[in-house]
């Protein structure tokens, strides 16, 4: 092959390999990069643009179907826009479902009229939405949020607790920092350690580090934890009578990655394969019929820009959708 012919073949191969972008997305792409402060090298830019466009088309298709009544929730482009679903799951979903020491079993209250709606934010026992960043520490945010609520109900003081303390210091109990963990392991660490520091004294860094716990800055403690039976009815009673509850869920789907508003129902969502720790802060229903369109009100740890200001409504009483009732628990605060 002559050099000129070889050069022509190479140029043709390069041209064929270059992604063909939809030019109508140019303004949105540049705005998205500016908003989320993305800087890429040339080769990575092409790849990330291709991923972003694929996600954008999926979102547009879903929202078109929503307008036609096919779905009960909307989707929108967000900070996860240049990630494939595989990358997204690896980076932010850090719940590690495994056998572990069980806590006390939740004793459901008898002869109690359970309210049809609950929102613990209205009682002042939920801190602002936080952001775990690119660290699989969802379990730490779920655990800290649950303990924040229990401490508030005991003391009347709402103090933001240190997720970094849990990330750095609970390895002996079985947690793996940014590589995942369990809320119950976190509660066990707090019990054995004798306390948990405040977020102010031990700020979040979104990466693994050495343990820097200082007892003089501890502002919360627990004496163990309670596991809730794997039924939505039991979870409902716990949320109504105990406070915000730590739960795990299947968060592996693109529909959740780009969730925006409405009641989330994903036909492929598993009630057993759980990969993300979150916090149930209430429940309710949309419309006028309390027996329809019911949802769990869930606080996430992906920042306020995701979902409904950091929250999501997940379908309730639909066969334990996404597994919220499968691994629910809360710390014991005396």
Swiss-Prot record:
It is found in: Lysosome; Apical cell membrane; Cytoplasmic vesicle, Secretory vesicle, Chromaffin granule; Secreted, Extracellular space. Induction: Expression in Sertoli cells is repressed by germ cells. The active site is at 138, 276, 300. The keyword Transport does not apply. SUPFAM superfamilies: Cysteine proteinases. InterPro entries: Papain-like_cys_pep_sf, Pept_asp_AS, Pept_cys_AS, Pept_his_AS, Peptidase_C1A, Peptidase_C1A_C, Peptidase_C1A_papain-like, Prot_inhib_I29. It is an enzyme of class 3 (hydrolase). The record marks 106-108, 112-114 as: Cleavage. One of its GO terms (molecular function) is metal ion binding. It catalyses: Specificity close to that of papain. As compared to cathepsin B, cathepsin L exhibits higher activity toward protein substrates, but has little activity on Z-Arg-Arg-NHMec, and no peptidyl-dipeptidase activity. GO terms for biological process: adaptive immune response; antigen processing and presentation of peptide antigen; autophagic cell death; CD4-positive, alpha-beta T cell lineage commitment; cellular response to starvation; cellular response to thyroid hormone stimulus; collagen catabolic process; decidualization. Residues 18-113, 289-290 form a propeptide. Both mature cathepsin L1 and procathepsin L are found in the upper epidermis. The lower epidermis predominantly contains procathepsin L. In seminiferous tubules expression is greater at stages VI-VII than at stages IX-XII. Zn(2+) 5 binds at residues 250, 253. Zn(2+) 6 binds at residue 273. Thiol protease important for the overall degradation of proteins in lysosomes. Plays a critical for normal cellular functions such as general protein turnover, antigen processing and bone remodeling. Involved in the solubilization of cross-linked TG/thyroglobulin and in the subsequent release of thyroid hormone thyroxine (T4) by limited proteolysis of TG/thyroglobulin in the thyroid follicle lumen. In neuroendocrine chromaffin cells secretory vesicles, catalyzes the prohormone proenkephalin processing to the active enkephalin peptide neurotransmitter. Dimer of a heavy and a light chain linked by disulfide bonds. Interacts with Long isoform of CD74/Ii chain; the interaction stabilizes the conformation of mature CTSL. This is Procathepsin L. It comes from Rattus norvegicus.
């Amino acid at each position: 092959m002559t050099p000129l012919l070889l050069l022509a073949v190479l140029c043709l191969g390069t041209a064929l390999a270059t992604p063909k972008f939809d030019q109508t997305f140019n303004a949105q792409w540049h705005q998205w990069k500016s908003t989320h402060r993305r800087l890429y090298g040339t080769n990575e830019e092409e790849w990330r643009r291709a991923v972003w466009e694929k996600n954008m088309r999926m979102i547009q298709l879903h929202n078109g179907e929503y307008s036609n009544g096919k779905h009960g929730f909307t989707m929108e482009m967000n900070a996860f826009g240049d990630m494939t679903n595989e990358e997204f799951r690896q980076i932010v979903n850090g719940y590690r479902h495994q056998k572990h020491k069980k806590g006390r079993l939740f004793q459901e209250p008898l002869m109690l009229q359970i309210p049809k709606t609950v929102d613990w934010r209205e009682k002042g026992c939920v801190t602002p939405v936080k952001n775990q960043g690119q660290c699989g520490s969802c379990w730490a945010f779920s655990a800290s949020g649950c303990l924040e609520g229990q401490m508030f109900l005991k003391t009347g003081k709402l103090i933001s607790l240190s997720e970094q303390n849990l990330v750095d210091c609970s390895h002996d109990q079985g947690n793996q920092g940014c590589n995942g963990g369990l809320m119950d392991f976190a509660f066990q660490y707090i019990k054995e350690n004798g306390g948990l520091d405040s977020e102010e004294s031990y700020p979040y860094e979104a990466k693994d580090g050495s343990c820097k716990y200082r007892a003089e800055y501890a502002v919360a403690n627990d004496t163990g934890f309670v596991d809730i039976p794997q039924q939505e009815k039991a979870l409902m009673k716990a949320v109504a009578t105990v406070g915000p509850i730590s739960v795990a869920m299947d968060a592996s789907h693109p529909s959740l990655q780009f969730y925006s508003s409405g009641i989330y129902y994903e036909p492929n969502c598993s009630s057993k394969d759980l990969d993300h720790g979150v916090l149930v802060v209430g429940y309710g229903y949309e419309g006028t019929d309390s027996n329809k369109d019911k949802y769990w009100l869930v606080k996430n740890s992906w920042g306020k820009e995701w979902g409904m200001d950091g929250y999501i409504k997940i379908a309730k009483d639909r066969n334990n959708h996404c597994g919220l009732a499968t691994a629910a628990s809360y710390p014991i605060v005396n």
